[in-house]
């Protein structure tokens, strides 16, 4: 797996104006996975009708 440091060198750093948002941007790719898990929890709650 590519480490965060190598990925940053490959894609470049964020412009300085966006540096405060860096931790948020690191979490954003996880959001679609959370929606997928939410779908399973929802179906389990309604017993997979």
UniProtKB/Swiss-Prot annotation:
Which SUPFAM superfamilies does the record match to this protein? Photosystem II reaction center protein K, PsbK
Q: Which GO terms describe its biological process?
A: photosynthesis
Listed A to Z, the keywords are:
Chloroplast, Membrane, Photosynthesis, Photosystem II, Plastid, Reaction center, Thylakoid, Transmembrane, Transmembrane helix
InterPro entries per UniProt: PSII_PsbK (IPR003687), PSII_PsbK_sf (IPR037270)
Q: Which residues form the propeptide?
A: 1-12
UniProt feature coiled coil, ranges: none
User: Which domain of life, per UniProt?
Assistant: Eukaryota
Membrane topology term reads: Single-pass membrane protein
- Could you tell me which cysteines form disulfide bridges? none
Membrane-spanning residues = 24-44
* GO CC annotation terms, alphabetical: chloroplast thylakoid membrane; photosystem II reaction center
Compartment annotation:
Plastid, Chloroplast thylakoid membrane
The main location class comes to plastid
| Assembly mode | PSII is composed of 1 copy each of membrane proteins PsbA, PsbB, PsbC, PsbD, PsbE, PsbF, PsbH, PsbI, PsbJ, PsbK, PsbL, PsbM, PsbT, PsbX, PsbY, PsbZ, Psb30/Ycf12, at least 3 peripheral proteins of the oxygen-evolving complex and a large number of cofactors. It forms dimeric complexes.
According to its UniProt entry, what is the function of this protein? One of the components of the core complex of photosystem II (PSII). PSII is a light-driven water:plastoquinone oxidoreductase that uses light energy to abstract electrons from H(2)O, generating O(2) and a proton gradient subsequently used for ATP formation. It consists of a core antenna complex that captures photons, and an electron transfer chain that converts photonic excitation into a charge separation.
Give the UniProt family note: Belongs to the PsbK family.
Q: Which PANTHER family match?
A: PHOTOSYSTEM II REACTION CENTER PROTEIN K, PTHR35325
- Stated name of the protein: Photosystem II reaction center protein K
**Which source organism?**
Phacus acuminatus
